Amino acid sequence: MADNRLSIKEKIGYGMGDAGCNIIIGAIMLFVNYFYTDIFGLAPALVGVLLLSVRVIDAVTDPIMGALADRTRSKYGRFRPWLLWIAFPYALFSVLMFTTPEWTYNSKVIYAFVTYFLLSVTYTAINIPYCSLGTVMTADPKERVACQSYRFVMVGIATLLLSLTLLPMADWFGGADKAKGYQMAMTVLAFIGMCMFLFCFATVRERIHPAVQTNDELKKDLKDVWKNDQWVRILLLTLCNVCPGFIRMAATMYYVTWVMGQSTHFATLFISLGVVGMMIGSMLAKVLTDRWCKLQVFFWTNIVLAIFSCAFYFFNPHATTLIMVLYFLLNILHQIPSPLHWSLMSDVDDYGEWKTGKRITGISFSGNLFFLKVGLAVAGAMVGFLLSWYGYDAGAKAQSASALNGIVLLFSVIPGVGYLITAGVVRLLKVDRTLMRQIQSDLEKRRSNYSELNEYQELKTSEHVRKA
């Protein structure tokens, strides 16, 4: 396993890739519902339809992108070059998505659908190869957790930068023109994100190569990946795991603005405090899994989160200091499973190669990314639909008691139920510490034997050529 150790520079470089991704996608997770309803001017229910409809297209684009990544052959590897090729388009479409044209309502609806779709496609094209990189940089499960911990600390720094600067920059650039402010603020953040992707490209390396390269058709790869029973289960975990946090994130601006009655400046502080908590949670993941199996840590953290989150419903939202402290602690707990989740994806990819003899990392991660995006869409749509159901009115000077109650439910009880469901799904996985030791040992022998066989065949071929 000595060759599988990663330098701190490479771990930071890998983390910078997701930092670049999340400084953009984080803006969507934190602000897209609020932006579309209160700035862009769309109806809440329509926002829900928008977020869900694009996921139908992802069902086609995600596996195609996974297959393309698996079949990429370049001097940079299979997955690294995509960071270089897609960084600029991803940044560009994020700016266009946060641009509000002065058009008719119907034209703006079309514009919103088109730009959100283009952003989603480029997100797929850069994120599937990026996520796949974590599997081929090292085969050591502990190094994978460490790498993912660095990754989510860097994500935390990027999200902190986002939460501290987006709203103030929007005010500074736009003044009374909030639409212009959001556009200019996103331009700055998108440029930073693009540079982060390029730094990641320059610092990481691919080390793990499949014993047998896949040259099969996409249809055959899709059929083979379903033979990995753990892959099917982690797809379900991906869907369930993303929903609670995103529902709360999407509801946070509404909770701070309408329930707590605070300003956008306070919202910046509140969200930033939560991000700091998430960074601490990312660092705790490595500490906890050094002592306990990651599946056990994942399960019990979600049980505690379910109780803690539901309890938020009963706290007085005007007890500002108490709410801030509890929100900080909640985010520490919330982030602990994130590095574990992504390292489990790599473990499941190893399990698939161990069980079937075929490694199709791009397809495997495209499925996970698709279910992650479905989870984000379901969560975002749920926020939009429930706000509409409870009578939320973006143009009102004050919200009704029903609307306020709906916001509090979205911030507390509904995520709590999601955490409980996630804990149940974790129990379906069997890639624990003991099994992974066996898998790594078997795969190392298999790759070594295949490498020796290739060398022998090349030697015999060269001897035959010389004799001829």
Q: What are these model-derived regions, one by one?
A:
Residues A2-K467:
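Membrane-embedded alpha-helical bundles of multi-pass transporters/translocases
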